[in-house]
UniProtKB/Swiss-Prot annotation:
PANTHER family per the UniProt record, alphabetical: ATP-DEPENDENT CLP PROTEASE ADAPTER PROTEIN CLPS (PTHR33473:SF19), ATP-DEPENDENT CLP PROTEASE ADAPTER PROTEIN CLPS1, CHLOROPLASTIC (PTHR33473)
Family: Belongs to the ClpS family.
Official protein name in the record: ATP-dependent Clp protease adapter protein ClpS
Leader sequence segment: none
Source organism per UniProt: Yersinia pestis
Domain of life per record: Bacteria
Assembly behavior: Binds to the N-terminal domain of the chaperone ClpA.
Coiled coil: none
One GO-annotated biological process of the protein: proteolysis
Gene name tied to this protein: clpS
Protein task: Involved in the modulation of the specificity of the ClpAP-mediated ATP-dependent protein degradation.
Length: 106
């Protein structure tokens, strides 16, 4: 019997959808930017509180912010990165510091 129903073959469509579904999400770098007013201790506190760094790593990153102007705190999916940026910026404002946290595509 011949294949008269070839037009019903949706296998190629399913494979395309599976490939789309398996693509990893876009990732974003969360960055702390230096300013002349935020105390170093506060930057360390932020790195420990919001990014779960131990004191040694938080201190290293704080020094990168201080001497290089910025430091990458981590790379996350868009939703996680946006949430971390919002929380850090809100926490800085609540504590009356101009510390700025931003994100950029990784």
């Amino acid at each position: 019997m011949g294949k008269n129903n070839d037009w019903l073959n949706f296998e190629h469509l399913v494979k395309d959808k599976q490939i789309e579904a398996l693509q990893p999400p876009s990732m974003y770098k969360v960055i702390l930017n230096n300013d002349d007013y935020t105390p170093m201790e506060f930057v360390i506190d932020v790195l420990q509180k919001f990014f779960s760094y131990d004191i040694e790593r938080a201190t290293q990153l704080m020094l990168n912010v201080h001497y290089q102007g910025k430091a990458i705190c981590g790379v996350f999916t868009a939703e996680v990165a946006e949430t971390k940026v919002a929380h850090v910026n809100q926490y800085a404002r609540e504590n009356e510091h101009p510390l700025l946290c931003t994100l950029e595509k990784a």
